[in-house]
Amino acid sequence: MRKGFLGMTAGTLAVGTILFLMPAPTVGQDTPPGPPREGGGRGGRGGGFGRGRSPLPPAGPFKRTADGKPDLSGYWNAANNGGAVFEVQKHPVARPGYPPGPGAIVDPPDGLIPYTPEYAKKAKANFDEHLADEPELHCYESGLPNQMYRQFGFQILQPAGYLVMNWEFMHAVRIIPTDNRPHGLPASTRLFEGDSVGRWEGETLVVDTTNLNDRTWLDSAGNVHSDQMHVVERFTPVDERTINYEATMDDPKAYTRPWTVKFPLSRNMQPNYEIMEFACIEGNQDVHHYIEETGGKAKAVIP
């Protein structure tokens, strides 16, 4: 019996064998480890889920960097995101492979992406072929905002003047200057994670991202965007274990108006948690076996 290549979504293969990045001691990581509050998500290596241990004490305030900014460094997971990894918009009715959920959209109030007619058709076509077409089958990075609600955890490092985000999934990395500099890439350069620059507005880190390509989906259901999408993210610390995350997407080619997602990020409290090596092999035969066993037909590699 063949093993499916996929975990929670098509194209997911985690190989937990080699430590990818050792955690460096920082001002925001000196709290003694304890059992997890939300669990560590998929992937990673830690000291177990702490079954039967006492609950954590109340969370304290965020620690500060040397320049007085909130220290966001540590390991994080998207928590209570309404099943956005399956489908970011409201999906109250289960579909094959997709459990129902409220999604993560808070604006518009109906919880749906305000598509133009052309891109609504693209999204429907993507869902109809998602087992064969999902970009992660080709080892693409997830892009924004999809990267933020993946089932795998990520690490934040905060050297002076920067925020670095390192995901286990696809080994995606974002290096974000936080000095409010202008965007530096020409319009013709389009990336999976785009060109991100940040600035502090009080306690909130605001990250502005342009220059995204159109080769990623917003979720595993095939919701889509164009190469004109502009994303503004807001990271607002609540306490030492919680960051409120919000992102607004504006795309005049794909959407009739901007729309916004919002959900909390929870600090990973597993003892000795580490991000692990991740392997994704485009064209792996298990992908074709999975597609065939679910009644689909494997397609050629997307150029």
Which role does the model predict for each range below?
Residues 2-303:
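PEST-like low-complexity, intrinsically disordered acidic/proline/serine-rich tracts
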